[in-house]
Amino acid sequence: MIYFIDDFLDKNLFEETTRRLNSSSYVEYETPGKSFWIQETNNDFNDYVLQKLQKTEGNKLENILGFFRVSNDVVDTNWRIHSDLNIQGEQPDRALVLYMSPRKSNELHGTALWRHNVYGKSLPKETTNEEFDRMIIAEAENLDMWTLDSVVGYGENRAISYPASYFHSKYPNVSWKEGRQVFVMFYKIK
């Protein structure tokens, strides 16, 4: 199930968090074949998000990883269509994207969900790490391997949660000059 919640953070927390994001620098974090520009989060913020998700989903949840990231018209401009089934050696059940910055584009913008020509809409949970890595390197930018299924539109303080096995990317691949700031979290159902 995919769902989204508008006004996810309460107003004070949202304003405080965006002030902090805008007054701090993002640092490059390198992974095989990809760099991200991130800011770390803190336990209080992660706990707030997790508690809100637990209330919404009706399950006890465990955070695997959460951080803020930015993309703009220069930084992080590739498609990188992928699944989140392998996060720091763990297999999350779900992923969350929380849009933090104001929308600066009138074009369709948000989180795209894709269908792979072989696997369909999601990567099988039994997929090996080698196949996961191969797909990221060989197919994440090859639009001939993918069909766009849908796009959940961008909205400031909108959270979208989806199964971690689903193939997705930002949409489109290039964000606006001021930057698309998001919080991402990968989590398990206990």
What are these regions (language model features)?
Residues 1-81, 110, 117:
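Non-heme Fe(II)/2-oxoglutarate
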